Amino acid sequence: MDCTPDVQDKIDKELTYLIPSHKPTDPPQVIANMAIIRSGLISIPIGRTDLIPRGYEIKDKRNLIPVDFPKFKFDLRPSQQKVYDEIEDNAIINAWVSWGKTFTGLAIASKLKQKTLIVTHTVPLRNQWVKEVEKVFEISSGIIGSGSWDCSGPIVVGNTQTLYRNIEKIKKTFGTIILDEMHHVSSPTFSRIIDSSFARYKIGLSGTIERKDGKHVVFRDYFGHNVIKPPKENYMVPTIHVVPSGIRFMDGTRIPWANRVTALTQNEEYMHTVSMLAAAYAARGHKVLVVSDRVQFLKNCAQLTGDDTICVTGEVPHEERESLTNQILHGTKNVLFGTQAIFSEGISIDNLSCLILGTPINNEPLLTQLIGRVIRKQENKPSPIVVDIHLLGNTAKRQASNRVGYYMKQGWEMKYI
């Protein structure tokens, strides 16, 4: 966009974000989303056409790549149909867990009838999209990632890492781009893929569009101002079981958070507490998910819990994870120990009905995502339970109070065990 120095300065201020640091003494992180091409010529993100001054001529060079879409084989629920009808341009769909974002996203792709790229950031998420494409269209999707480069067909599902390395090859190939778990778009890897794409339609999907680090302020830059938030539905209401443990979580601002978590997860009493809880809820008929961000802790707890368990961490190859989780979904295993990074987003094991928080959490979006793993509807599934272990110490009490406040805000019943 051609502009005067005054206009450039105004837009630069509008598109520069100061993100507070975790430490009050550290300077804020600066995110600048205006690019200077040369003197008097700038580039702004596609979602911020509102910053273009009046009187400017806008030449739309976005790509329309029309393709023949197969018929969508299913009916949408009324709330999904409403979102489907509303989508005419770029948008964010901020839908509660289990609402059906993947399902509705594919219906929208069929409505727009453009060659479509689905962007995912993990192999399991990519595989879920591939399966959903087969289910709703009865076709195979193209795949980009894990050594594959197949752009044939109306829908292609790709991994961010491979797409990022090949931006020049894909930026003019698609007419619609859908970013799953779009709250990651503040990361340069994701934002470059979205911002570089010439696709006419850009749709972001997420269950949580607030980030604890405050970077959600940039979301509209890439998807515009239209945020569609359908009602919460199609989920089971969980009950919160609060377990006072008597185990202390270290206090002290001079002790790094990571060191405090490590000390907790190396505490033998804590390991036995988590393991016994997992075994107890499995004995009641639940399929149990225990999450933590400490791999050795998960391994130790799985060993203590017994043969009824599987453990899925980053050390497990992608091709083995599905066969392991199938032992929970279809087999005889009842307890799944897994890392937060893997199981916080999008992984659908619908018969999971009990979540045990193995690591202290003070992040509301993360808590929402994790609880989402156990509240999906399934026939004959036990009423879901979230097990919240309360620890001693000022930090632990403050964080537990925040979680209790979140549960109360949702209107969920709490029981102290």
What are the language-model segments listed below?
Residues 12-63:
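Interdomain "pre-motor" coupling segment immediately N-terminal to P-loop NTPase/helicase cores
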Residues 34, 58-94:
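Conserved pre-motif I regulatory segment
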Residues 146-176, 187-192, 342:
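Conserved helix/coil segment N-terminal to the catalytic DExD/H
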Residues 164, 314-410:
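Conserved RecA-like P-loop NTPase helicase motor core
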Residues 89-112, 117:
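Walker A/P-loop
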Residues 175-176, 181-241, 407:
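Post-DEXD/H (motif II) to motif III coupling segment of the RecA-like Helicase ATP-binding lobe
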Residues 109, 252-293, 299-303:
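Conserved interdomain hinge at the start of the Helicase C-terminal
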Residues 127, 131, 139-152, 165, ...:
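Conserved helicase ATPase core of P-loop NTP-dependent helicases/translocases
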